[in-house]
Each structure stands twice: as C-alpha cells, then as structure tokens.
Amino acid sequence: MSILGKIQRTQPLILNLANFLTPQRVADVISFIGASPLMTSEIAELESLVEISDAVVVNIGTISESTYPLFLEACRLANQKAKPLILDPVAVNVPFRASIVKRLSQEVKFNIIRGNSAEIAWFADKKSLNKGIDALESNIDNEHARLAAKKTGAVIIETGKVDIISKGHEEMYVDTDSPLFKINVGCGDMLTAVVGTFAAVSDDLFTAAYEATKFFGEAGMIATKQVQNLPGNFVNSLLDTLYQATQEIK
C-alpha cells in the first residue's frame, strides 16, 4: 500500500507547534490529505497529546524565549515516545533562532529537517549567498544537504529550484518547482506538515520525505496551471488538488 493510502486508512494524528502566521493553512493541508491536525500552546497537556499523536511537527517561525519550554518539552516527549519529530527551522541563520535550535539540538534528536538552501547551509556549518525564508539559490548542489544530514543524523529536505532529500550518503531529487510557492507565505510550512503526515505512517523516513515532497510539488505544478500563474487563488487550488489526489486512491 502506498504511503498516501496508509494515511487514508489510518488517519494519523499530527501534533503541530505552528507559527502564528499560518496555523490555518497547516491544519487544512493535514486535514485535506486525510489526517487529523492537532495544535496546542499549553505545556501542561503536552504529554497526553504527544502520547496520542503519530508525529510531532515543530516550526520555529514565531518562537520566543517564553515559548521555548513548550517546544523543548514537545520535542523531548516525541523522542521519549518514539514519535517522528520534524523540524521547520525558519530563518535559523538569524542569531536568536540559531541559539534556540542549538539548545534544542543539544537535548533532542530531530528525525527530519525541512528548510531552504540558507537554512540547510546553517546545519552544515556553511554560509549561503541567501538569507532567511526567501532563499533563491537555483543551482543543484547536494553538499550542504549531505553535510547537514551527517551532522544532525536527520533526513534533510532542502527545498529550492530542485528539492534535495538526503540521508547523508544517499540523495533523491524532486524537480517540481513553482514560483507561486515563494509568493504565498506558508507554503513551506504546509510542506513540512505534509512531510510529518507521511512520516507518521512510514518506517522509512527517507522515502517518506521524498514521497511527501514529490506529492506536494506535483500538486503545486497542477495548481499553478489552474490559476494561470496568478498567486491569489493558488493556495486554494493547491489544497483542492491535494484533496482530489487523496480521493483518487480510495
């Protein structure tokens, strides 16, 4: 059975520590592909929520010193309970966020890390020509993804013109870029949520990361054509395309 088929059959529960810009889009994409989204900002309920969840996705896009204990506890519990732990390290090359991720990484192990070229370069201890959430590097170079995977022990997804999925000694590539992904804030967050959903039902996280990235990218290409390269309706079309794909396998 395909990973998407397993999602339809098991309807996994995905716990998200989302940033406050895109929680609705993240919840929608998880729901539209057949899983159940769950979010919290309360540390007291984390143990019970992680216990019933099938994966934990953390996004540092709006993290603060006051919310750090929530993130640390969610990650710690995910490791303790052997739940896939997925990180979206938004703008990790900014000093405060870098310090947050360094502290988290000293305490927990992330299973999958999804970021753009600048963010993944940070994990590889390399500098990128680009900054923050809008890195635009177009060359296909797996060096940073491979180094990041070796240093972190995580499966790395480096998104860009061509997406690179690496586990340190092997890479797969997804060539499904759309310019509308960059214009619409939150598409990266949505992809990370899809990756978490695929990871929730798969024992092979490398394959799950690749299949999720490919699935999301192909839907983006279809949606781009449907909206004739106009960004305003892109996310709605993307969600509809993802939903239709899940219905076709039922």
From Swiss-Prot:
Record InterPro entries: Hyethyz_kinase, Ribokinase-like
GO molecular function: ATP binding; hydroxyethylthiazole kinase activity; magnesium ion binding
Annotated positions binding substrate: M39, G186
Keyword Transcription: no
Pfam families listed in its UniProt record: HK
Keyword entries, A-Z: ATP-binding, Kinase, Magnesium, Metal-binding, Nucleotide-binding, Thiamine biosynthesis, Transferase
Signal sequence bounds: none
Binding site for ATP: R114, T159
Known cofactor(s): Mg(2+)
Keyword Disulfide bond: no
Superkingdom of the source species: Bacteria
Enzyme Commission numbers on file: 2.7.1.50
Chemical reaction(s) catalysed: 5-(2-hydroxyethyl)-4-methylthiazole + ATP = 4-methyl-5-(2-phosphooxyethyl)-thiazole + ADP + H(+)
Function: Catalyzes the phosphorylation of the hydroxyl group of 4-methyl-5-beta-hydroxyethylthiazole (THZ).
Family (UniProt): Belongs to the Thz kinase family.
Name of the featured protein: Hydroxyethylthiazole kinase
Gene this chain is encoded by: thiM
